[in-house]
Amino acid sequence: MQDQIILYNGPNSPFGRKTKVTALAQEVNIEEKIINVYEADFIDKHNPLRKIPTLVINQLSITDSDNICLYLDSISKNDTLFPKKNYWEIMNLTSIANGLMESVLERRMETIRSENEKSKSFINKQEIRIERTIKWIENSWNNYNNDYLTMDQIAIACALDYTIFRFNYRWKSENRKLNEWFEKFIKKNFMKTTKPYEK
């Protein structure tokens, strides 16, 4: 009997998208349920932090997008997204991409606060961090031309697309090598079918 795998996700979480892309790329069959974490108190029994994504397999709960991606990769019959020969480089770049997602998300949350509550200095700090991180990826990343798929590629693509979704397109003209790779990668079916949206 096949395990029932449920991914609790949101319509525009870059972390959730990363896990959905991983499932599609690794051909792991999952059921995705889009939820509003502010209302979904039922998920507390699976994840007391009430964060998405959260993966539930029968009675097992897996939280944190990296853990979920590792699990999905481990049960796939496809080649791993975490090859041993450059495992730590992949993990480091994935963490950098996660940090980029977090900065874009924190900037977004600050910009939608009321005018008397929002901090322009905090917003500016996040914008500087976003631009610095993308430039670092442009100059430091070595997996542009791999002929095989790895986790850092998925994470970086999701982070860059989320930057476009929540911030701006400016990085594209200022990081041409990265943008050239991104424009090709974003055309893959698992990216086209997981675009973030407002619900």
Question: Can you say where each PLM-predicted feature lies in the sequence?
Answer:
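Non-transmembrane alpha-helical segments in soluble domains
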Residues: 69, 73, 91-94, 134, ...
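GST-like fold's C-terminal all-alpha helical module
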Residues: 97-183
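GST-like domain detector, emphasizing the conserved glutathione-binding G-site
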Residues: 1-121
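Conserved residues at the C-terminal ends of beta-strands
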Residues: 58, 157, 197
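Secondary-structure boundary motif
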Residues: 45, 74, 139-146, 187
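Short polybasic/polar patches that bind polyanions
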Residues: 24, 165, 187
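Generic structural signal for secondary-structure transition and capping sites
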Residues: 77, 102, 142, 190-191
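Charged phosphate-binding loop/patch that engages nucleotide di/tri-phosphates or the phosphate backbone
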Residues: 173-174, 179-199
